[in-house]
């Protein structure tokens, strides 16, 4: 059985720590991004993790980087574990170019839930997208909607774009 990886300790200079990913400085303008198995919801990181979540998140990122190749550039250099680092990083790390990011969170909603439900109750819309009257919490939406927002730091409110 694999171990749930919620704490990542490397002998590298930390660059940033998010709710799920930790990023470390490498040489020559490169960073090492590591996806942990930490679980977060509604701005809370829970003490228990989900086994292999980091590998799944990394594979999802790689899928989209490949799918969007030729359409939009990305920062990916390699998915190999750098020499001298622990084997538990296999499948959960990416060496990337250090770039200026555009902090946008892209959400596709298929169901009326969470902050979308709260918005709908107040305005009949989610992120300015008018929806039919009479929907209930957890209702399936007539069609998925795209609701991008700024990616807020912990404790700050996001802004719908």
Language-model segments: which ranges?
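Conserved small/polar residues in nucleotide/adenosyl-binding loops
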Residues: 159-161
């Amino acid at each position: 059985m694999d171990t749930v990886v919620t704490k990542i300790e490397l002998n590298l200079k930390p660059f940033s720590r998010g709710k799920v990913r930790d990023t470390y400085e490498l040489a020559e303008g490169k960073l090492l991004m590591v996806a942990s198995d930490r679980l977060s919801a509604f701005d809370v990181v829970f003490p228990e993790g989900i086994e292999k979540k980091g590998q799944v998140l990394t594979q999802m990122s790689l899928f989209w980087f490949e799918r969007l190749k030729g359409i939009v550039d990305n920062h990916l250099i390699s998915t190999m574990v750098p020499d001298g680092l622990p084997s538990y990083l296999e499948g959960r790390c990416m060496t990337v170019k250090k770039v200026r990011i555009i902090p946008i969170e892209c959400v596709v909603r298929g169901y009326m839930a969470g902050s979308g439900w709260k918005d709908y109750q107040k305005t009949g819309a989610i992120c300015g997208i008018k929806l039919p009257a009479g929907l209930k919490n957890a209702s399936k939406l007539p069609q998925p909607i795209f609701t991008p927002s700024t990616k807020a730091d912990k404790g700050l409110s996001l802004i719908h774009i």
